[in-house]
């Protein structure tokens, strides 16, 4: 078993010998007592400085004394210091080596804090969370990495019970969108979780302020996906195909995306009970599942590409 489960400590650089299998993504010779306040533009850093917003995030996370929290992007610890006194354990994943090393000392070395220097896009949660452990994720995500991190968490094992994430407002709107305004991100998010907008976050809430407004979203992860499909990979192949040309009617966008021709695409939609003139953004997840099921069957039967 990985040493992260066995030894009380505060900072793991993630390349230590007893927690092998993941290489460090950032190296730093900074002292753990370092107190850097300047954000690194190359890492997309914007430090949360608004205590009111911090309170909204923690309220949305609905913390309890038995909670295990994975915090992604703790930065200078504005959220971390409020969580360590309220939950069982906090595992903080920070890409910036200097900040990762400084965080435990900044918070007076709380016994229930483990800080890991790693890229959340690559981190193996099984190295951080004991098997069968329920956990929540609280994250202030850099804009450039938000989508892959959220996708990795939703597709991971073990999955979190709840995610409370700070993302760009436009991304947040896409995550919670309803039929009529849905996109690939909407379908991908809501296939795995119920999504709820918590609040908007103005640029002035950060140091330095970003150029765009952010938002906090809560995701309650479903015990089973929103649709029962034989292959999640196949399901999302169909969804991506449908959104290949989102302004076109489904008959054309789906046919183009799957490379099956408009006649065959029309037949798939007809058998699935979907009006071929609809736009992809109007479909809900069960309707996408119906299209996938017909497509998978006809593909197995050798669909003509006409």
Feature annotation, model-predicted:
Residues 1-12:
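Extreme N-terminal basic, low-complexity initiation segments
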Residues 11-241, 270, 274, 281, ...:
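Catalytic cores of RNA-modifying enzymes
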Residues 255-257:
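Short helix-coil junctions and helix-kink-helix linkers
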Residues 246:
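Primarily a LysM-type cell-wall glycan-binding module
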């Amino acid at each position: 078993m990985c040493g992260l489960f066995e030894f009380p400590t505060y900072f793991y650089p993630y390349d230590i010998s007893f927690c092998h299998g993941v290489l460090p993504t950032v190296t730093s010779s900074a002292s753990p007592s370092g107190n850097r306040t300047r954000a690194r533009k190359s890492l997309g850093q914007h430090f949360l400085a608004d205590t009111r917003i911090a309170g909204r995030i923690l309220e949305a996370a609905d913390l309890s004394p038995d909670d295990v929290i994975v915090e992604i992007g703790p930065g200078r610890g504005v959220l971390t210091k409020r969580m360590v006194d309220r939950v069982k354990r906090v595992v903080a994943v920070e890409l910036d080596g200097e900040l990762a090393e400084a965080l435990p000392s900044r918070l007076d070395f709380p016994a229930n804090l483990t800080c890991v220097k790693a890229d959340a896009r690559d981190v193996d949660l099984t190295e951080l969370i004991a098997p069968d452990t329920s956990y929540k994720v609280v994250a202030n995500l850099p804009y450039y990495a938000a989508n892959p991190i959220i996708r990795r968490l939703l597709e991971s094992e073990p999955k979190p019970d709840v995610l409370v994430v700070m993302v760009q407002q436009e991304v947040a709107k896409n995550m919670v969108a309803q039929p009529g305004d849905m996109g690939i991100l909407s379908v991908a998010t809501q296939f795995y979780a119920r999504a709820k907008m918590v609040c908007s976050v103005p640029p002035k809430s950060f140091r330095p302020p970003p150029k765009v407004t952010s938002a906090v979203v809560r995701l309650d992860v479903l015990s089973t996906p929103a649709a029962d499909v034989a292959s999640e990979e196949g399901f999302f192949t169909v969804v991506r195909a449908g959104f290949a040309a989102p302004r076109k009617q489904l008959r054309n966008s789906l046919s183009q995306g799957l490379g099956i021709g408009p006649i065959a695409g029309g037949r798939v939609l007809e058998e699935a009970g979907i009006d071929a003139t609809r736009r992809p953004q109007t479909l809900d997840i069960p309707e996408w599942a119906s299209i996938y099921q017909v497509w998978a069957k006809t593909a197995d039967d050798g669909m003509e590409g006409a």
